[in-house]
């Protein structure tokens, strides 16, 4: 199939367009004013909105004016602030979108150009799209403006690398739009720089004014504080100097006064000594006359008063001793009543023992003997050779060690027996004895030197035994002993019950050790309290 002349021309034109010579011969084509106008308006609007958004971030007043009076400005500001925290993602999305749009535009332009080439007979001259990058000085510009210029330069480089062949009219329109965008961005950059410099100058002047104000205020305050401190130090120095001089003057006056008083005292002393000597002679003569007269029996009265004071001391000691004995008797009766009270399961008599100790110590002070054999203390004797210059008599007798009294011995035994321990009542001792019935049954079945098997066997067979009660016999088997002890405890015959239990040997005695200890403590306390009562009654 033969190709037509038009198709040959199209093929030839494509071959020439693939060669990067910059121009190609084509038939004349109609200009696209609407498309060029659209590109110019779009790029201008983009530059206007981009500049308004960037300057709104620097100046709040301009931002309010821009968002309130320019259409779609508020939405664009919100979108910018939304993507401001993630600029990398925003740039990637913008670049992908611009690349896709440019590819679509290029494909559309290519398709439409091919269609128009096939349908048109008139061929016009085409040029390869080659745009100049935006050479704008961004050294001191806003970072966001730098990003926008960089993105636009990347887009221009991408369009240049694609080697698009477009008609000359469109090429001129795009180039003009590129120049307009470059001019607008340059103006925007200069505007931003000027606004930033004005803002920095204004802010610097404000900061300098504020610092000057602070400096003047701090200077005035420092001068005021310095003046105040200096005045205060001067006042303190003046006050201290005044006090020091007053103190020195007062000391000098006091020293002169003391010197004058000492001189006057010496003169008066010399005069008074002679007068006192004469006065003493007169008084001595009068005293001798009175002593030989009305005061002749003064020594006899003094001896009788001493005898009366001794009698009062002896009476006081006797009364105190009787009161101590009464209190001791009361405490002993209190201990007896508590020990014999069956309503109390156990008794602690530590408080009563402390009172007994106090009363016994008080009573022992009344029973002390004199240091001399004749019953009189050396200090009571007159005319003794050991009498000193001051009338005191030093005793030369050897100290006597009195043997401990029965009262103190009984108290010590009571304290060692009952200190920190509880005394059981007769009923409690009887109940504890009844609790030993099962152990007694087991012990009655144990063979001599029984082992674990013997213990278990005796424990099992003891369950089939009965406890022996009633009138006890004189037999020595365990049941009879248990019955006799229970009968003695029932009639409160604790002494015989303890003797029966103590006579046991072997395992039964081992079982009853705790019970024997409690019962013996009860018996010992009863006997010691009885001895204490008898001793108190003999005093």
Swiss-Prot record:
Please give the chief subcellular localization of this protein: mitochondrion
Query: Which family is this protein grouped under?
Result: Belongs to the MICOS complex subunit Mic60 family.
Name the lineage.
Answer: Eukaryota, Fungi, Dikarya, Ascomycota, Saccharomycotina
Q: Which domain of life is it from?
A: Eukaryota
Q: Where in the cell is it found?
A: Mitochondrion inner membrane
Q: Which organism is it from?
A: Saccharomyces cerevisiae (strain AWRI1631) (Baker's yeast)
> Is Membrane tagged as a keyword?
yes
What name has this protein been given in UniProt?
Answer: MICOS complex subunit MIC60
What's this chain's function?
Component of the MICOS complex, a large protein complex of the mitochondrial inner membrane that plays crucial roles in the maintenance of crista junctions, inner membrane architecture, and formation of contact sites to the outer membrane. Plays a role in keeping cristae membranes connected to the inner boundary membrane. Also promotes protein import via the mitochondrial intermembrane space assembly (MIA) pathway.
Q: Which residues form a coiled coil?
A: 172-267
Subunit relationships: Component of the mitochondrial contact site and cristae organizing system (MICOS) complex.
Segments in the Mitochondrial intermembrane topological domain: 57-539
GO biological process per UniProt: cristae formation
Membrane topology, as annotated, equals:
Single-pass membrane protein
